[in-house]
Amino acid sequence: MLIDGKQMHIQITKGDIGRYVILPGDPARCEKIAQYFDDPKQIAHNREYTLWTGSLDGVPVAVCSTGIGGPSAAIAMEELVECGADTFIRVGTSGGIVDKVKGGDIVIATGAIRQEGTSREYLPIEFPAVADFSVVSALHEAAQALGFPYHTGVIQSKDSFYGEIRPAQMPIADELTAKWKAWKAALMIVAQVLHVRCGAVLNVLWNADNDDAPAIPPDATERGVKAAVEAIRVLIREDSKA
């Protein structure tokens, strides 16, 4: 929706950004992420949406915060697509569920359990929330190149950050890698509706079921960002061959 020639919420227009966008939740992280770009500059700030642009390998890229939760994340993706974006990597944090996922690891999401509300406004619950294969592959290549400990798997998206896992839901945990990523399922579903690419990489802060988890390395919260940036470089190279 345009108001005075700009998208209503993110306050930019077509031509302001390129194809590739990193999506953190926290507006304060945008400037930090943009420092990995060449020629970074802030181009918009409105409500929870802060937007910086720059380039990687000579190709325009951007970072846009989404705030907390599925509704605001869906708005960001909808409006970014209207402005020309078609490839998204969500960068965030999570807790681990299975014992092998430790604090300091990163998780590359292949799909998400839709236990939130936003995605249901787009597609019925039977429709799976899955990440784009090319983005997952690029993140996998990036994590290997950077030497980060990583895992791939399904994550759990819920609307309640503090909500307890009910006993009846516990069997789900055996098949999950990470949980408490409130809006990833929403982004995956919106991306499929809009026919764009979306993936996610999460920094694991702790293991929810392991009190003896090792101390988190100082650079742990930046590992997901570095993996996302390197994955975009991979996608740029692959897309240039198409």
What feature does the model see in each segment?
Residues 26, 63, 92, 155, ...:
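Buried hydrophobic positions in well-ordered alpha/beta secondary-structure cores of metabolic enzymes
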Residues 138-146, 190, 227-238:
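Generic non-transmembrane alpha-helical segments
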Residues 1-137:
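Metabolite-binding pocket within alpha/beta catalytic cores that recognizes anionic/polar moieties
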Residues 130-183:
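Active-site rim beta-loop-alpha module in soluble metabolic enzymes
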Residues 82, 162-167, 171-173, 201, ...:
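Expand to "…catalyze enediolate/carbanion chemistry for C-C bond making/breaking, isomerization
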Residues 40-45, 147-154, 235-242:
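Flexible, glycine/charged-enriched surface loops at secondary-structure junctions
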Residues 186-217:
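Zn-dependent metallopeptidase/amidohydrolase metal-coordination segment
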Residues 208-242:
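His/Asp/Glu-rich mid-to-C-terminal helical/loop segments that flank catalytic regions of hydrolases
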